[in-house]
């Protein structure tokens, strides 16, 4: 079936488009974007509306699967769609609300009206595989290896990368960050983090995390630049991030 979205303001920053245009869609794929009048089997009047690629929310925490009832929180996904978000990335800040492979399996089976990606949360892995772990204390090398192997299993199972909540697990050492992140190296997957500190120490904390990515030559993402943490330091912080892109 041919669907035409008509008379909308089409905004596509990637292709430098901002114009009133008509979009021709067939089987879920765009066939044509044209300024000329055209009709299809189904016509959607977008007069006064913006038509654009779906937004990607790279930082969500709503990756909950209700095992006993076997359902996902579809209302959250629908709320995201209402805001124009079509792809969501969960499992951030080191936290998974559901065991990653269980959640990904549920997404495949039950479906959601948005695309879902998932990070493997370091904090949850640490708590599960390290006996009597204490978030305030460093852990032994053998335990670090256990975390890395489990993270690798999750990455091979479909997770996009590893997330860290360094601020919430202050016992994480540089060695632990580097060794666990090696699981991302084979497929050049990403690591992201809520860094170790904020406010006056935000620059130092960001540099600590950047060092991990540079040492392993893998992509990184700084999950947050807090408004108060960046106050008076934002230009310096953005220059730092730009310098290592």
Where are these regions (language model features)?
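Short coil/turn connectors at secondary-structure junctions
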Residues: 1-2, 39-41, 47, 51, ...
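N-terminal metal-binding scaffold of metallo-dependent hydrolase/deaminase domains
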Residues: 1-39
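Divalent metal-coordination and catalytic microenvironments
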Residues: 8, 23, 28, 48, ...
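Short loop/turn motifs at secondary-structure junctions and domain boundaries
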Residues: 12-16, 69-70, 142-144
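Active-site neighborhood of phospho(di)ester-bond hydrolases with catalytic His/Asp-centered motifs
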Residues: 52-59, 89-92, 119, 190-195, ...
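Divalent-metal coordination cores built from histidine and acidic residues
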Residues: 60, 72-163, 184
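Histidine/acidic residue-rich metal-binding segments in metalloenzymes
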Residues: 138-164, 169-245
